[in-house]
Structures are given as structure tokens and as C-alpha cells.
Amino acid sequence: MFDDDEYGFEAGREFCCDFLSNLYSRIYLPGNDIIQYGEDFPELYMIQEGIVVLSLKGIGPDNEFFILPTYSYFGDYQILYDLKSQILFKSGESKHLITMCLKNSKLKELMEDYPDARKFYRARAWHRRIELRRRMKKHLQKLNMKNQVKSKT
């Protein structure tokens, strides 16, 4: 979260302290919705334990297209680019989800206070958005092919 060799970024000690000192924990029961389609992100979520399942709009296992594992995070590009969720974020079915969170407003404040960090996090968030949209489109294509096969039979 605080350094990236690919981008040549290492967050300064002061930024890390400000970031970490504002984290708080949230625990979700298995299968709970975290962020629904069309909602704003109130916070940045870092998964400490458990998984988060990402689904397209609609209900059912066919709509699930990606799983965020322990130690990953989400909400960054939605907050930094003021975007509403285009997918459903839900805790995994088998165990509790424990996240560490940073309020939306605090993340934006940190980005204003630390311009170097803002440049890095916005660039990385944009790349994460592109990758997630690529996976979503790939899943939609797979669903469309599956539906075409069903309709022919």
C-alpha cells in the first residue's frame, strides 16, 4: 500500500503515520452486502481477513466475476475519481470479513496534503479501474456466450 517498485514510489513516514492513525475496523458477517450497485464509497477498505466477492448488477452466482483476497483493498478509484459503484461488493459466504477502513473524506484530505502521494495513488487507482473493467467485460462476454448456447438448445 505504501510502496511500489513498478511505479518507483515509496510513501514518506509522515504520510504513513497520518494514514495508519486514521484507520478503524469493520467486521461483516458472511454474505453481507458492503457496497451496492450505484452507491458512493464512504471509505477505503483494506481486507485484513476474509474475501470480498464482486458481482455484476443482479443476483446469482453467474454474476460473480472476481474475488478480492485477504490483504487486498477496494474503494480507491471510486473515491479518488468520485465514481459510484458499478458493481456489488459482498463479503464471502464462508467466514467473517474483517476490514481496516479509512474515511472517504480523510483519504481525500491526505491526497491534498501529500501531492506526491496523490499523483501515485491516482495513477495506480486508474490502472486498477481499467483492470477491473477488463475483467468485468471478459465475464460479460462469457455470460453472453453461455446464454447464446442455452438459447440454441
Named regions from a protein language model:
Residues 62, 76-131, 135:
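Eukaryotic low-complexity, acidic/Ser/Thr/Pro-rich regulatory regions of large signaling scaffolds
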Residues 1-94, 105-106:
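Regulatory nucleotide-sensing modules
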Residues 1-33, 111-150:
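Cyclic nucleotide-binding regulatory module and flanking cytosolic helices
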